[in-house]
Amino acid sequence: NLIQFGNMIQCANKGSRPSLDYADYGCYCGWGGSGTPVDELDRCCQTHDNCYEQAGKKGCFPKLTLYSWKCTGNAPTCNSKPGCKRFVCACDAAAAKCFAKAPYKKENYNIDTKKRCK
């Protein structure tokens, strides 16, 4: 679920940036998404959005699905059995790892999405 995703982000980035910093970034980080991603980090969010969309098509509810995971050496790893829990966990873990690698550009936080995300 979204709280677990926030915790995964903290695991992957070693707590260097609050999870909420990603909630309103670029065109895809946060609710919804459209247009061309503004940078590598925004592409991570677009991929995560697409993963959640695939989960929804499988009958899962990714924002609410509770799964089992652990933080091992700054890498989130999923422990859930196959099915919705494992699928959603994999979406979140991949995104958290992607966020940790991508540069965070303050100028892409809280942008005017109506102008920049066409």
Swiss-Prot record:
Superkingdom in the source lineage: Eukaryota
GO BP, sorted A to Z: arachidonate secretion; lipid catabolic process; phospholipid metabolic process
Compartments where located: Secreted
CC per GO annotation: extracellular region
InterPro entries registered for this protein in UniProt: PLipase_A2 (IPR001211), PLipase_A2_Asp_AS (IPR033112), PLipase_A2_dom (IPR016090), PLipase_A2_dom_sf (IPR036444), PLipase_A2_His_AS (IPR033113)
Name listed for the protein in its UniProt record: Basic phospholipase A2 PA-12C
Leader sequence residues: none
Family: Belongs to the phospholipase A2 family. Group I subfamily. D49 sub-subfamily.
PROSITE patterns: PA2_ASP, PA2_HIS
Gene Ontology molecular function: any one: phospholipid binding
Role summary: PLA2 catalyzes the calcium-dependent hydrolysis of the 2-acyl groups in 3-sn-phosphoglycerides.
Binding site for Ca(2+): Y28, G30, G32, D49
EC number: 3.1.1.4
